[in-house]
Curated annotation (Swiss-Prot):
GO cellular component: ribonucleoprotein complex; ribosome
Purpose of the protein: One of the primary rRNA binding proteins, it binds directly to 16S rRNA central domain where it helps coordinate assembly of the platform of the 30S subunit.
Protein name stated in the entry: Small ribosomal subunit protein uS8
Similarity section: Belongs to the universal ribosomal protein uS8 family.
Phylogenetic lineage: Bacteria, Pseudomonadati, Pseudomonadota, Gammaproteobacteria, Thiotrichales
Keyword check for RNA-binding: yes
Pfam families cross-referenced by the UniProt entry: Ribosomal_S8 (PF00410)
Keyword terms, alphabetized: Ribonucleoprotein, Ribosomal protein, RNA-binding, rRNA-binding
Listed SUPFAM superfamilies: Ribosomal protein S8
Gene Ontology terms describing biological process: translation
Subunit and partners: Part of the 30S ribosomal subunit. Contacts proteins S5 and S12.
Gene Ontology MF terms: rRNA binding; structural constituent of ribosome
Amino acid sequence: MSMQDPIADMFTRIRNGLSAEKEFVSVPFSKIKMEIANFLVNEGYIKSCSKGTTSMGHPSIEVELKYHAGAPVIEMIKRVSRPSLRIYKSHADLPKVYGGYGVAIVSTSKGLVSDRKARDLGVGGEIIGYVA
């Protein structure tokens, strides 16, 4: 059976791994998911990510989850724009997640950036998801 929304699946795997207090989570590989994983590393929400392979030989992304004092660093990770309903915003209309505490992942013409950086660059785009 094919996966309808691979990014939502990635977010769910991360959320489930955090609730089960796992150290690593394996996600099927795609370029956009690797970009999102690198974004989460740069923003400090996960420790690291690397490309690997499953036992079946399929490419995957190994995500090392991050905890602080035993609690997950990611309190909330949520998919916003989805295949059946894409959400696009201009730089002026980009939302502040948790009053600026969290970050919105925005896909722009300048690549995958945070809502703060998109506002600074003056570009809008598709809101992939929220992380806090």
